[in-house]
């Protein structure tokens, strides 16, 4: 999820940095949502870790992830929130897995 003060077109590429991760269960399967901030967004680039976000923004994200698949009759549960360091580790692991599977 990219927190941005501007509207972004679907499939846009935006230079971002991770501030945290929301771990959840999506229809019974583990799912991790990396929360990112655009490098050049003056509204949000003051935040370096998910713990710094205003409570209402954090609550909106958690609520969204808890209901966003309701129309598909699928259950989602927000489980845990982890910091920037954990999100960065997940991104690095995913890059390594991509290289292993698609670049050799």
Which functions belong to the PLM regions below?
Residues 1-104:
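Hydrophobic N-terminal alpha-helices or hydrophobic patches in metabolic proteins across all domains
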